[in-house]
Amino acid sequence: MASPLISDIAHSGLTVADLDDALVLWCSGLGFVLERTFTLDVEVTAATTGVRGAVIRAATVTLGPHRVELLQYDPPRLLESAGSPAQVGMMHIALTVSDLDRVLELCARHGWRPVGTPHRMTGGVRAGTRIIYLEGALGGFLELIAPPQLP
C-alpha cells in the first residue's frame, strides 16, 4: 500500500494585527504554550505567500498536539469590509473551553466579539454543548465549544 500524501495537519494559521497582544491572549489567557517566534523577510514572505513588500513577525503556540501560527504582516493589509463565516474560503479555529462565559470575557478584552449568542445543542453527539462564533476586530473567526460538565 502506498503511503498517504498527507500525514498530518501541521498547524492552523491566524493573521493578527498585533502579535504581542495576540500572544497575551493565546498564552496568558487561553493557556497555549509559546513554542517559537520567527520573522520572515520581504523576499521569503513574497516567495511563500505571494504578499509583496511585507515582513512577517510570527509565533507558533501549542496546546497538546495542536499548533496555531499567529502571523503579523508589516505593513498590514486591512479589509474594506468585514468577512462572514459563510464566505466561501473563510476559515475558523475552534477551541474546546471549560468555562464559556469566562473565555468570552477574556476574548472581549482583546477585541473578539460574539457574532451571535451562545447556542446550546439539543440533540446528537454534542447535546448540551454551548457553541458560539467570535469575530476579531480586524477579521478572523474563533469558535468556542463548551461541552457539558461531566459529573
Q: Could you tell me what each predicted segment is?
A:
Residues 1-5, 9-17, 37, 58-70, 81-107, 129-135, ...:
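Vicinal oxygen chelate
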